[in-house]
Amino acid sequence: MEPSGKEDHNCPPQDSGQEEIDYKQLLEEYYQPLQACENKCWCKKCCFHCMLCFQKKGLGIRYHVYRKRVPGTNKKIPGSGEEAIRRAIDLSFHRTASRTYTANGQTTEKKKATA
């Protein structure tokens, strides 16, 4: 997002003249612990004005990525709990009902009557 010709972002106004750089002050600011920065502007000056903004805006680093919840994902899984046990029992009953066992332990399949 580039700002238009108008001042539509909340940056402090830039001086037209060159400012004298104080390296000690820059190093002190650099080594300070990261603090919350509420600057919403994405211009070049605001992206590089502090270490936190540089990491967030310049490099795109996010330490707390919040997942978007998809509606309906908290539904019960149909294969869990008592339903799965009931299905397993029903399936095993249907398997054994279609077979007959002989005295020597062999199984034979029953044939369905066709009309």
UniProtKB/Swiss-Prot annotation:
Interacts with host CCNT1. Associates with the P-TEFb complex composed at least of Tat, P-TEFb (CDK9 and CCNT1), TAR RNA, RNA Pol II. Interacts with CCNT2; the resulting complex is unable to bind to TAR RNA. The gene is tat. Keywords: Activator, Host nucleus, Host-virus interaction, RNA-binding, Transcription, Transcription regulation. Its main location: host cell. Residues 37-53 are annotated as: Cysteine-rich. Pfam families: Tat. It is found in: Host nucleus, Host nucleolus. The keyword Magnesium does not apply. Residues 54-64 are annotated as: Core. A motif (Nuclear localization signal, and RNA-binding (TAR)) lies at residues 65-73. It comes from Simian immunodeficiency virus (isolate GB1) (SIV-mnd). Transcriptional activator that increases RNA Pol II processivity, thereby increasing the level of full-length viral transcripts. Recognizes a hairpin structure at the 5'-LTR of the nascent viral mRNAs referred to as the transactivation responsive RNA element (TAR) and recruits the cyclin T1-CDK9 complex (P-TEFb complex) that will in turn hyperphosphorylate the RNA polymerase II to allow efficient elongation. The CDK9 component of P-TEFb and other Tat-activated kinases hyperphosphorylate the C-terminus of RNA Pol II that becomes stabilized and much more processive. Extracellular circulating Tat can be endocytosed by surrounding uninfected cells via the binding to several surface receptors. Endosomal low pH allows Tat to cross the endosome membrane to enter the cytosol and eventually further translocate into the nucleus, thereby inducing severe cell dysfunctions ranging from cell activation to cell death. Through. GO terms for biological process: positive regulation of viral transcription. Belongs to the lentiviruses Tat family. GO terms for cellular component: host cell nucleolus. InterPro entries: IV_Tat (IPR001831), Tat_dom_sf (IPR036963). This is Protein Tat. GO terms for molecular function: RNA binding; RNA-binding transcription regulator activity.
